[in-house]
A protein has these predicted regions:
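A domain-level signal for the structural core that forms small-molecule/cofactor-binding pockets
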Residues: 1-188
Length: 188
């Protein structure tokens, strides 16, 4: 199995190196090293997701807190499952706890974990909310993801668009429009 992976990586490096040579003005560049470095960094990003999501939520604390908690502007980068181009931006999370809270850095860990794969912004937004609901068991969550998609800029610059915003609500945030409005206000 390891030999097949190494062989595949070698083929990818060679193909990418050839591609870089064709699109580069500088024939003196060491395209083999550039290709290898690019693929190594890409592999690191995708391997980050291997972390078990349940381990992110292993340090729950019993708490008597019945007011919303807002975690704003967690940066992320992911890759579109349609085009493989990156999209990047910020995730904001509103959680109305029930019995448990989570350390603030754990929300960032969750976002990094779930964004380390080919996905769609809409799927990422929902998946973040669903995982928090599943593991933290809050009264509800409201998720806002604002991102820039490079596919629109690179594939069709004349039709380039600004940021795309997606939202997702579950639990009490799905039922109570005033809580959603409060969350949206705290995320701006």
């Amino acid at each position: 199995m390891s030999k097949n992976i190494n062989k595949t990586n070698t083929h990818l490096e060679e193909a990418l190196s050839d591609f870089i040579s064709k699109i580069s003005d500088d024939s003196n560049k060491n395209t083999d090293l550039i290709a290898k470095k690019f693929l190594t960094q890409l592999e690191k990003k995708f391997n980050f997701q291997k972390k078990d999501i349940a381990s992110i939520f292993s340090h729950l604390e019993g708490v008597n807190h019945n007011h919303p908690i807002y975690i704003n502007k967690i940066p992320f980068i992911s890759f579109c499952e349609h085009s493989m181009f990156p999209f990047f931006g910020e995730v904001s999370i509103a959680v109305l706890p029930d019995k448990n809270i989570l350390g603030v850095s754990k929300f960032s860990d969750l976002v990094n974990n779930l964004s380390s794969k080919l996905t769609l912004q809409e799927k990422l937004t929902e998946e973040i909310g669903e995982k928090i609901l599943q593991y933290l068991e809050p009264q509800g969550t409201y998720i806002k993801v604002k991102a820039k998609h490079l596919c629109s800029d690179l594939l069709s610059p004349e039709n380039s668009i600004g940021d795309i915003t997606t939202t997702y609500a579950n639990g009490i945030y799905e039922l109570d429009s005033s809580l959603r409005a409060e969350a949206a206000l705290n995320m701006s």
